[in-house]
Amino acid sequence: MKTLDELITERRSVRKYLDREVEPAKIAMLAEALRLAPSACNAQPWRIIFVTEKALKDKVTSEGLGGVVPNTWAKSAPVMIVACSELSLFTHKLAESVQGVNFHLIDIGIALEHLVLKATDIGLGTCYIGWFNEKPIKKLLNIPSSWKVDCLITLGYPEVVPEATPRKPANEITFINKV
């Protein structure tokens, strides 16, 4: 088993996948990682859809991606994860009205990081996609109006594991006590 530091260091945005099914047992492991993620007041606002059926995944990809950034590479992924937030939760509505903070986005970000690190741990690759057309995705997947599609994540066995991309030094992005 790899350490957390190794998983954080090894995680990459994968854009080329093998034509290989992701086993249901591995999807269950990812679901468990999501389930254990912390959230504001333990509200667990995320609703995650694993689209594994090829015909449906292809429709989600063709109808949901496009526009300025078409992300055509996403079609090679055997699984498309559709990450949604339940917007009708009282805790999150209160926080947004009082503090102007969208806690559902913070919560889902934490949960999805659990997912991508677990995916890395079990030999799977992922890539976040933030540019998509929500309306056709909601229609194709019968997503309720009270849910917001926050992002998509491709999932599968990497055909190519990309090299690490340059990162800013820690002293440029972190501060102790004052800026």
Task: Please name every model-derived segment.
Residues S85, W131, Y157:
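Short secondary-structure boundary segments
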Residues R12, A55, F132-K135:
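Alpha-helix/helix-capping structural signal
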Residues L34-R35, I81, E96-L140:
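Small-aliphatic-rich amphipathic alpha-helix that forms the alpha element of a beta-alpha
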Residues I27-R35:
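A structural motif
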Residues N42-A111:
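Glycine/small-residue-rich phosphate/adenosyl-binding loop
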Residues P70-M80, N142-A164:
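A glycine-rich helix N-cap at a beta->alpha junction
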Residues A43-W46, L124, D150:
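Short secondary-structure junction motifs
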Residues L4-V14, E23, L89, C151-V179:
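C-terminal helix-cap and adjacent tail motif
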